[in-house]
């Protein structure tokens, strides 16, 4: 799998997600100015920056099938990363025919996200929706919520 990426600053997150979904399939990341190896399976990820926003675009080709998506984003690196990873996850899971139990979350503790969202004043329904937006299954989202409730009691008792 060849992945063409015009934003080196999101390479780690993109590569981690692709490796989780593709398993043992070799992944080659190609940055601007590098030669592109021949491979029928490819992903092209581009971020076009404008004044106050960006347009994120993902084209995934796998086993002769092609999926494409575009979405606006702010210029914030974290939001760009989340937008790209969400589109990438949706395109690859559609092409592969399987999802991951924790969705597109890589290297992130879901309970930590739940804690942060709770502390930001979000309601449980909003938090669950946000987690499912990340591709987290409803069962895993509920597990994260339950775990946070248990941890919260312990932390507050300290």
Predicted feature residues:
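A short, structured N-terminal alpha-helical element that caps or precedes a catalytic domain
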Residues: 1-94, 98-100
């Amino acid at each position: 799998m060849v992945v063409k990426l015009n934003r080196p600053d999101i390479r780690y997150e993109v590569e981690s997600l692709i490796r989780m979904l593709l398993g043992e399939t070799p992944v080659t990341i190609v940055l601007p100015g590098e030669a592109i190896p021949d491979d029928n399976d490819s992903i092209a990820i581009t971020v076009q920056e404008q004044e106050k926003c960006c347009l994120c675009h993902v084209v995934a080709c796998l086993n002769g099938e092609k999926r494409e998506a575009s979405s606006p984003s702010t210029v914030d690196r974290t939001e760009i990363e989340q937008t790209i990873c969400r589109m990438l996850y949706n395109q690859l899971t559609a092409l592969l025919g399987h999802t991951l139990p924790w969705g597109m979350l890589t290297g992130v503790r879901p309970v930590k996200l739940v804690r942060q969202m709770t502390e930001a004043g979000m309601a449980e329904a909003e938090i669950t929706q946000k987690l499912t937006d990340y591709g987290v299954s409803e069962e895993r989202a509920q597990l994260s919520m339950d775990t946070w409730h248990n941890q919260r009691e312990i932390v507050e008792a300290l």
